[in-house]
C-alpha cells in the first residue's frame, strides 16, 4: 500500500524562541525539565509516522501526550518547529499559503469534537458552509453537500435546523461538512467523544461503513481504547510528545513497548480484539485436496496415516468444500460412491472475522476442530478447543 501521509522527525515547541529547547532535548532532559529551564513547552518530539493510503490510523495517548497537537500539525493549523509533514510526498511545511489553502480545499479535511454548527443555518447550508467560504459556486456546493448528507444518512434532514437534531445527528452534519469536499485525508480529533456511549458506537459503525465504500485515509485521535480497537487498522501511542509505539491492535497487545503502553492495554478483553483468523492454524495435517484422482479410499488412508478422525476438503483455489470423517469415508466406500457422498451434513464453519468471544460455545459443542473460511469461502485454517482456550488464556499472561 502506498504511503499517503508521512511525518519525519517532527517537533513542535510552544513559546518564544523555541530553538532554545533543542540543546536541552539533545542532552536528554525531560519535557518538565525543559519547561522549568526555558519556559518552553514540548508538544511533539521527534515524531515519525508513515500512514498508508486507505487506512484508519488511530493516535492515542493520555491528556498532554501530544496527540491533538500532532493532528493539527498534519494540516498546518499549527506550524511545526522542525521536521516534515508530507502529503503525497510534498512537504506542506514548505509550501506557500496559497498552496496550503488549495491542499485544505481539495485533499484534507477535519472533524472536531465540537459540532460548531451555525444555529441560524439549515443542515444543508451548514454542510456547504466551508465550500461557500472557499468560493465554490452555489449549485456545485449544494450538489456536493447533498451527496455528503446522503453518505451519512441525513438527506431527509437537509432543510432542518441544528436544534431539531440529536447529538449524534449534529455530529453527522459535522462529518458531512468534511466529506463534502471529497478529501483524500480525513482528520478526526476525538470526533465522537462528546456523544453518549450508544450514539458513539453507532457513529463508529457509520465511519467503518463509509470507509468500506470510499477508502479514505483517516487519522483518528482518541483516548478511548475500545474505540481505537474497534475502528483502527493501526494505532500509534504517544507519551510526553513522543510516538512510543505503532502497530496493529493485536501487535501492540502482544508486544507492548513499555509500561506506559502496557498500562493502556491492561484488562483488555482479547476475546473482543482477536478474531477467528488470528488464531486459526493452517496445517497440512487432515487437509484433503479434492482432485479427480483423489477419492474416499485415498482420503481414508490419509486420515488413518495421520491418526486423524476428521478431514477438511478443499478444491482448486483453496475453496473450502466440507468436512469428512473416518466413518463417513468408510460409508461412501461401502457404497462405491465419490468423496462428495462422504461430506458431513451441515458442519459448523465460522467466518474469519468472527470475534473469539462468539466462538467459545460453537467450538465447545463441535465434534472436531472447526474450519474457518474468509468472505470468498476460501479455507483459512482450523480452530480446536485447545487452541481457543490457549488464545483466551493469553489475556492473563499479557495483562496480568
Swiss-Prot record:
Entry keyword annotation includes Nucleotide-binding: yes
Compartments it resides in: Cell inner membrane
Induction: Induced in response to increased extracellular osmolarity, this is the first gene of the proU operon (proV-proW-proX). Osmoregulation requires curved DNA downstream of the transcription start site in this gene, which is repressed when bound by H-NS. H-NS may act indirectly to influence the local topology of the promoter.
Main location: membrane
Cross-referenced Pfam families: ABC_tran (PF00005), CBS (PF00571)
GO CC annotations, alphabetized: plasma membrane
GO terms classed as biological process: amino acid transport; cellular response to osmotic stress; glycine betaine transport
SUPFAM superfamilies, alphabetized: CBS-domain pair, P-loop containing nucleoside triphosphate hydrolases
Residues at which ATP binds: 61-68
Domain (CBS) ranges: 280-341, 343-400
Molecular function via GO: ATP binding; ATP hydrolysis activity
Role played: Part of the ProU ABC transporter complex involved in glycine betaine and proline betaine uptake. Probably responsible for energy coupling to the transport system.
Family: Belongs to the ABC transporter superfamily.
PANTHER family reported for this sequence: GLYCINE BETAINE/PROLINE BETAINE TRANSPORT SYSTEM ATP-BINDING PROTEIN PROV (PTHR43869), GLYCINE BETAINE_PROLINE BETAINE TRANSPORT SYSTEM ATP-BINDING PROTEIN PROV (PTHR43869:SF1)
Assembly with partners or alone: The complex is composed of two ATP-binding proteins (ProV), two transmembrane proteins (ProW) and a solute-binding protein (ProX).
Protein name: Glycine betaine/proline betaine transport system ATP-binding protein ProV
Annotated source species: Salmonella typhimurium (strain LT2 / SGSC1412 / ATCC 700720)
Name of the gene encoding the protein in the UniProt record: proV
